[in-house]
């Protein structure tokens, strides 16, 4: 997921978030959706419930970043558009189901609700 925040985080940072939409793209390995989320505990971001609540310029910045972020690796990225909060929730449900089907997965690291 891509979490919208005002301050930097760090790899492995865990926080409670809610989805507000999804950015559809594909790279050389296939579909690579980016579920866009906001932190539940952040009073600045948690009022957003759908991509329509996000500043349109920020949407353009996110899209532009993912269009060019693999250019230096000479890899192609196909931008396939945006989906709403319901589509994001469907993707998360599918991902959660796949995760829950994994045998011998580590327990207690985090939870997906």
Predicted regions and their residues:
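Hydrophobic N-terminal alpha-helices or hydrophobic patches in metabolic proteins across all domains
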Residues: 1-113
